[in-house]
Amino acid sequence: MLKSFLIFLVRFYQKNISPAFPASCRYCPTCSTYMIEAIQKHGLKGVLMGIARILRCHPLAHGGNDPVPDHFSLRRNKTDISD
């Protein structure tokens, strides 16, 4: 039930708050979609993964493809980093 509520909050952000700002996420999937997928896959640990992802998303980040890993990790997928 807590997972559903957290996902509801992210979807509320996606539909009602995010459209008011220009697109700025440097990753695919977007940080909010990543948060939802991480919560679905890893439960409450997924919230930590989503927060870590948001902290990595800044103007100096390379961005690119960074899917939710199958195992819990607060770091970016090393196999998906493109130089």
UniProtKB/Swiss-Prot annotation:
Belongs to the UPF0161 family. InterPro entries: Membr_insert_effic_factor_YidD. The keyword Membrane applies. Its main location: membrane. Could be involved in insertion of integral membrane proteins into the membrane. HAMAP family: UPF0161_YidD (MF_00386). It comes from the Bacteria. Residues 68-83 have a biased composition (Basic and acidic residues). Residues 63-83 are annotated as: Disordered. It is a peripheral membrane protein. Keywords: Cell membrane, Membrane. GO terms for cellular component: plasma membrane. This is Putative membrane protein insertion efficiency factor. It comes from Streptococcus agalactiae serotype III (strain NEM316). It is found in: Cell membrane.
